[in-house]
């Protein structure tokens, strides 16, 4: 049997909280936002993050100053494959490791954010088959418009079930929004505008369109925006475009004062949001939460495959007038010319949509989840 070294809880310390949300940024960022909120609520609270060695958490969690405990991943096959036969053994190994972490840090509550890190945490929190273990209360948070398998299982045993939007598929869930880091929710775009534009080499005057398609970029967004570059420049609109580290962008030379700044990725999203007047982006749960939190009008372009959850993520914001949903197949240079450019030139409409976006979001979601966690733990 493998032996693990785990950071243990100091005697006499505050509450011990485990956040379980690894793999993708959509699971990790809400977990870290809640971790930050817990520290703001009570600096004595100990937060431990669960993750796997192959997820983004191996970089993101240490950067934010939290201990990370690794467990074996438990990917849930979507279709019957040979991996389904390996699932029971993988679950047992991961639950055993998670229990070791729970015991070592003397966890008072576990907050799960879905994905293959959360499922072992939910299963390990119980008293076990022989009913000899100390049960740890569980809180489930679902960021997506359609709940995943892990959170559906966790919701059955959870003390509190939270969701980003109504009708997530988790009965009785309390809608709290998506936890977003304070550097975004507290962002003063007006105050940072000049600094942000200087950071990216954008002109002080004139509208700026921000374009990004997630951590890997999006080809359809790249082709549509770059294809309309001459018309954007002619209208005096600058572009800040994160095209993805694996993609290249062919942008024709344009004259005038407007600039087209193309970068592989954006490490300072706070400055990117502050520099922009509108956004063209995908509609992952975290993207929608951040864009609405900062009050930016958006053209949301859901992924054209999967279960359609990206469109559902954007619907509440769009219903309030804070954005538009554009099918991937309809985002073309012509659409940018006919729809995006006129909006960026209409300051009144931009202001109205920005206010609607900010009003539809949940800027205090991280603090609310933190308060619920403390209440459940005690």
Swiss-Prot record:
It is a peripheral membrane protein. It holds the Pfam family Glyco_tran_28_C. GO terms for cellular component: plasma membrane. Pathway: Cell wall biogenesis; peptidoglycan biosynthesis. It catalyses: di-trans,octa-cis-undecaprenyl diphospho-N-acetyl-alpha-D-muramoyl-L-alanyl-D-glutamyl-meso-2,6-diaminopimeloyl-D-alanyl-D-alanine + UDP-N-acetyl-alpha-D-glucosamine = di-trans,octa-cis-undecaprenyl diphospho-[N-acetyl-alpha-D-glucosaminyl-(1->4)]-N-acetyl-alpha-D-muramoyl-L-alanyl-D-glutamyl-meso-2,6-diaminopimeloyl-D-alanyl-D-alanine + UDP + H(+). It is an enzyme of class 2 (transferase). Coiled coil: none annotated. Gene3D superfamilies: Glycogen Phosphorylase B. Its main location: membrane. One of its GO terms (biological process) is lipid glycosylation. It comes from the Bacteria. Keywords: Cell cycle, Cell division, Cell membrane, Cell shape, Cell wall biogenesis/degradation, Glycosyltransferase, Membrane, Peptidoglycan synthesis, Transferase. CDD domains: GT28_MurG. InterPro entries: GlcNAc_MurG, Glyco_trans_28_C, GlycoTrans_28_N. One of its GO terms (molecular function) is undecaprenyldiphospho-muramoylpentapeptide beta-N-acetylglucosaminyltransferase activity. Cell wall formation. Catalyzes the transfer of a GlcNAc subunit on undecaprenyl-pyrophosphoryl-MurNAc-pentapeptide (lipid intermediate I) to form undecaprenyl-pyrophosphoryl-MurNAc-(pentapeptide)GlcNAc (lipid intermediate II). PANTHER family: GLYCOSYLTRANSFERASE, UDP-N-ACETYLGLUCOSAMINE--N-ACETYLMURAMYL-(PENTAPEPTIDE) PYROPHOSPHORYL-UNDECAPRENOL N-ACETYLGLUCOSAMINE TRANSFERASE 1. This is UDP-N-acetylglucosamine--N-acetylmuramyl-(pentapeptide) pyrophosphoryl-undecaprenol N-acetylglucosamine transferase. It comes from Nocardia farcinica (strain IFM 10152).
């Amino acid at each position: 049997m493998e032996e693990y070294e785990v950071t243990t809880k100091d005697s006499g310390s505050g509450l011990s909280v485990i956040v379980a949300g690894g793999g993708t940024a959509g699971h990790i960022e809400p977990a870290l936002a809640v971790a930050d909120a817990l520290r703001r609520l009570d600096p004595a609270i100990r937060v431990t993050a669960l993750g796997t060695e192959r997820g983004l958490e191996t970089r993101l969690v240490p950067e934010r100053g939290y201990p990370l405990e690794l467990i074996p991943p438990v990917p849930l096959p979507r279709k019957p494959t040979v991996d389904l036969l390996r699932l029971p053994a993988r679950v047992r190994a991961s639950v055993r490791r998670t229990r070791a972490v729970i015991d070592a840090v003397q966890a008072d509550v576990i907050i799960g954010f879905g994905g293959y890190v959360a499922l072992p945490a939910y299963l390990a929190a119980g008293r076990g088959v022989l009913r000899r273990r100390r049960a740890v209360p569980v809180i489930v948070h679902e960021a997506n418009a359609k709940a995943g398998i892990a959170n559906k299982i966790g919701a059955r045993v959870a003390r509190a079930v939270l969701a980003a939007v109504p009708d997530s598929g988790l009965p009785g869930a309390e809608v709290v929004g998506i936890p977003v880091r304070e550097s975004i929710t507290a962002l003063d775009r007006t105050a940072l505008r000049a600094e942000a534009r200087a950071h990216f080499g954008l002109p002080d005057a004139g509208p700026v369109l921000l374009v990004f398609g997630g951590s890997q970029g999006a080809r359809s967004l790249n082709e549509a925006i770059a294809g309309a570059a001459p018309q954007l420049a002619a209208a005096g609109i600058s572009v800040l475009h994160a095209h993805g580290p694996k993609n290249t962008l062919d942008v024709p030379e344009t004259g005038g004062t407007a600039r087209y700044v193309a970068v592989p990725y954006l490490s300072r999203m706070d400055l990117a949001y502050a520099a922009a007047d509108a956004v063209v982006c995908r509609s992952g749960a975290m993207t929608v939460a951040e864009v609405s939190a900062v009050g930016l009008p958006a053209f949301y372009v859901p992924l054209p495959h999967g279960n359609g959850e990206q469109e559902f993520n954007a619907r509440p914001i769009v219903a309030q007038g804070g954005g538009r949903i554009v099918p991937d197949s309809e985002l073309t240079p012509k659409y940018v010319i006919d729809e995006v450019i006129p909006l960026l030139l209409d300051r009144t409409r931009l202001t109205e949509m920005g206010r609607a976006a900010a009003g539809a979001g949940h800027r205090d979601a991280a603090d609310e989840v933190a308060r619920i966690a403390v209440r459940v733990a005690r």
